[in-house]
UniProtKB/Swiss-Prot annotation:
Record's protein name: Uncharacterized 9.3 kDa protein in nqo2 3'region
Keyword Cell membrane: yes
Topology within the bilayer: Multi-pass membrane protein
Coiled-coil zones: none
Compartment(s): Cell membrane
GO cellular component: plasma membrane
TM spans (from-to): 25-45, 53-73
Amino acid sequence: MARPAGHAASQAGGTAAADARQMRLVAAVIAVTMALWLGVQWLGGQQDWPAKYAFLADLAAIGALIWSLLVTFRIWRRRKASSQGQG
């Protein structure tokens, strides 16, 4: 079945919109991660929590930041491929 002429353009626009949504999600995850990480570090210092809880907060923050980096890398690769006419 033949595709409508505007199908490729609408698909590219949909990909750009999806990329924009994902980048907003990445930005929110980074901002919330940093705020929570700083808050937990401060609260742990005030309440004299054991160091294991600080390390747990560090690992959770590292996990969120690695996820953000991977999603950003995927978006970058997808945009690079589409700008070179491969996607």
